[in-house]
From Swiss-Prot:
The gene is acsA. It comes from the Bacteria. ATP binds at residues 387-389, 411-416, 500, 515, 526. This is Acetyl-coenzyme A synthetase. InterPro entries: Ac_CoA_lig, ACAS_N, AMP-bd_C, AMP-bd_C_sf, AMP-binding_CS, AMP-dep_synth/lig_dom, ANL_N_sf.
Amino acid sequence: MSEKIYPIPDNIKKNALIDEETYQQWYQESINDPESFWAKHGQCIEWFKPYTKVKNTSFNGDVSIQWYEDGITNVAYNCIDRHLKTHGDKIALIWEGDNPYHDKKITYNELYEHVCRFANILKNHGVKKGDKVTIYLTMIPEAAYAMLACARIGAIHSVIFAGFSPEAIAGRIVDCESTFIITANQGLRGGKQINLKDSVDHAIEIAARQNVHVDQVMVIRRTCGPIHWVEGRDFWYHEEVSHTKTDCPAEKMNAEDPLFILYTSGSTGKPKGVLHTTAGYLVYASMTHKYVFDYHAGEIYWCTADIGWITGHSYLVYGPLCNAATTLMFEGTPTFPDNGRFWEIVDKHQVNIFYTAPTAIRALMGAGNSFVERSKRTSLRLLGSVGEPINPEAWEWFYHTVGNNHCPILDTWWQTETGGHMITPLPGATPLKAGSATRPFFGVQLQIIDAEGNVLEGETEGNLCIIDSWPGQMRTLYNDHERFIQTYFSTYKGKYFTGDGCRRDSDGYYWITGRVDDILNVSGHRLGTAEIESALVSHPAVSEAAVVGYPHTIKGQGIYSFITLMEGTAPSEELHQELIRHVRKEIGSIAILDKVQFAPQLPKTRSGKIMRRILRKIAENNFDNLGDISTLSEPQVIDDLIANRQNREITA
């Protein structure tokens, strides 16, 4: 296959931190002598007690991952305190509100005071090292303060995206046994108010029925909206922050002390609590941010991700601040008040590096070029893509229309579990191909493997595995190490299985082809099909449900549901809409059923297993070759499913 290659622009090549020769040299060193390589690069953060041990990892047996295990440091200290002498007056955080007329600029000195005050409030309310703190906030500066305050005192934060339902919030509270929640009365997004506190109150009631009791709720006042209040449990942040001390010593944290738990969808339905620890994570977040974005002092860097996702953790908060960068946080959406908002912000704040998701790119591409062309965007130097594979058409539009043909696009592949970038171009070292994540980052050893476990060489396609550890790797699933082993290390023994399919071309470039397990990637958000199916069958009208993904021009993947109703229940448009609302209520606003097909029966094997492979083909409108259907118990079911498919506008 021949793809157009975009060479490295001269202006990038001239000033890049990493060129092609350095990439090759460092990569070989990182693979051949990882101990030495990571010993050297572990010095990118400051240590209270230096490490003498670097790498102690095994992907076999009980699976154990430790990096810098005898070192002592603190994440908040590295993200704030160490910059104060030389960068105290530098802008650390630019906040752009949902309202285009609202913004704030916070220096490193001011960030230090905000975080110390926040940390002291937590301590005054009994939060201590090792406690779990749930954060349910929209994109306001206090969300970053909360994360950094937890890191400062050694509390473990669990940030939940402020779009998840009370049921989803409760599940996460119960799983990590969190008794302290930080939220706001309301949030603002896209000109709409989101009732955060109401969702938290409901979640607390659900958690209590499962014997997990939330003792304290800190509430940030974002709007003047009404609020339900529980005396003795709830307290206002603004009432305490004004008379709290502006100094709080950073807790001495062992390198392997937990930093945060972040929940991601699992194929069994129950979300997985991905656990990241202190030092290895920060070293990797800092290093990938610096070299992938070729970050130079003084640049304005904007990652549009929400703090509820790993991208917001690694590349909005921890990575940039560890590198003394100026990071921009945006409260709103790309389409409010109109489709030009992103580009107006780029001009307003003179953004140099812009990192967003293919879903946003496709939506804005669909809105037409006029919204882009009314802005200048001359400050832009680099563009980035994250969350899902970017299709070549969107890549080309991003490059030519947004980047004016001169901004390299950093198409980054990584996961919640990996902590940071795994396959990515480096601006000064990597010629680009539209739609390819290109080459592995330092220390990342990739293998493509077939279904039988054979390693495939050269130009090929198969399942993507990683054969050795890296510092940013998750350590376990919270309270479920056995599930951690089974999920990631049992498919191919001694290897981390990513769950993604991958193609390697003749130039050694990698192309991610999508999930090979039962996880959907909807607008860059991972949703488990089992989780959606469980939500559907919890409705009294639903007997059985199967959920698959299908190609969606904006979201990348859409959610297609096949539903069998209870005896005596007839399909109707009213029920169709009710089921859409029901799933949103159970999981959250990101789980919108795009296609609902009522079916008298689902295709099953003789042992009763639903043949999702066939349903995927039908959902993709690709039913001419359904493959082997000899194991179907009732083959005639297929004809009905094809005749009543809901996706006729899709071309195969």
